[in-house]
């Protein structure tokens, strides 16, 4: 009798963004938490239905939730859906992470960092943080690279590394399902 060969099933994760920094953070977090799984990571463009630059904690979280909902509607059948939305409140920037499956939801907010006064002043002109950072620091498309985090920490941290940690925290209900009732 021939040996039984177990095929690993590739599990699909839809990331409600095509931003490389966000996609890399999701890839890194899932690979860290579930090292024995094989994943297919698919970044998709879906609306957040909030301002291009959310200016409150509540609006930012709602943007991440909306991204997950819209990704589920447009791309059914994935095992996980991940929405990430960066925002600003007062003088700080942060991001919300929402991870959903059919049975569960996890959420977490990233660490926050203070923004320079000149950046905050220019943000009042209804611009996105990435665009303002490019103007002030003379960079190009920083939001898809290290982000404001990378610039302001002199690359000791990046957008992806900070999001990685927050995504692992959002995965807690999936790591410990016995302690979290299904959504």
Swiss-Prot record:
Its EC number is 3.6.1.73. It catalyses: XTP + H2O = XDP + phosphate + H(+); ITP + H2O = IDP + phosphate + H(+). GO terms for molecular function: ITPase activity; metal ion binding; nucleotide binding; ribonucleoside triphosphate phosphatase activity. It is an enzyme of class 3 (hydrolase). Pfam families: NTPase_I-T. The keyword Oxidoreductase does not apply. HAMAP family: Non_canon_purine_NTPase_YjjX. Belongs to the YjjX NTPase family. This is Inosine/xanthosine triphosphatase. It comes from Vibrio cholerae serotype O1 (strain ATCC 39315 / El Tor Inaba N16961).
